[in-house]
């Protein structure tokens, strides 16, 4: 994020490889956003103009996530798996997730739940208004070739997870 040529590099890479910008998402972590908010806002504005999606990763775990939420104008909030792992038994974590879903809707962002491992978690998240998730329920880490095979299947294994 500190490289003044980052937006140009991203734009040139998208053009060179003929990648539609809506297929790319840049995830921001708290370390990147704590450096200089004015500089980060400027850099993100340049990247946003390219049509690339911006996400705050591990939302809810950093000391300043809420402070930066309104300043950074991102497209996606990714709620950390810390809140998902005991979602079915921890009322406090359910309340935090519900609040995060409401925040994401209020800011016009998509919400992604990280670390979803069970159908019960997926169902609860869906019922709370979260429409996107990632985790072992859907797929485990895999080599690129296996990922390609997964994407080209006619009947994706994870289509009914929600």
Regions found by a protein language model. Give the residues of each.
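A short alpha-helix in the C-terminal ATP-binding CA
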Residues: 28, 96-99
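The catalytic core of metal-dependent phosphodiesterases that act on cyclic dinucleotides
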Residues: 2-87, 103, 107-141
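Residue-level marker of structural boundaries
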Residues: 74, 93, 152-156
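C-terminal helical cap(s) of enzyme catalytic domains, especially alpha/beta-barrels
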Residues: 126, 142-162
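Short, conserved glycine- and acidic-residue-centered signature motifs
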Residues: 40, 92-93, 97
């Amino acid at each position: 994020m500190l490289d003044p040529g980052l937006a140009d590099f991203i734009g040139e890479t998208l053009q060179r490889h003929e990648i539609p910008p809506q297929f790319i998402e840049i995830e921001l972590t708290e370390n990147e956003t704590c450096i200089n908010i004015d500089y980060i806002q400027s850099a993100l504005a340049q990247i946003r103009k390219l049509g690339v999606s911006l996400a705050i990763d591990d939302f809810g775990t950093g000391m300043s996530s809420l402070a930066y939420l309104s300043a950074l104008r991102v497209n996606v909030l990714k709620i950390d798996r810390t809140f998902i792992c005991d979602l079915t038994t921890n009322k406090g974590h359910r309340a935090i997730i519900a609040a995060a879903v409401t925040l994401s809707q209020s800011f016009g962002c998509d919400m992604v739940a990280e670390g979803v491992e069970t159908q019960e978690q997926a169902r609860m998240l869906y019922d709370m208004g979260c429409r996107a998730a990632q985790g072992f329920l859907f797929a485990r880490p895999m080599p690129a070739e296996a990922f390609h095979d997964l994407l080209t299947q006619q009947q994706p294994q994870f289509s009914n997870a929600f």
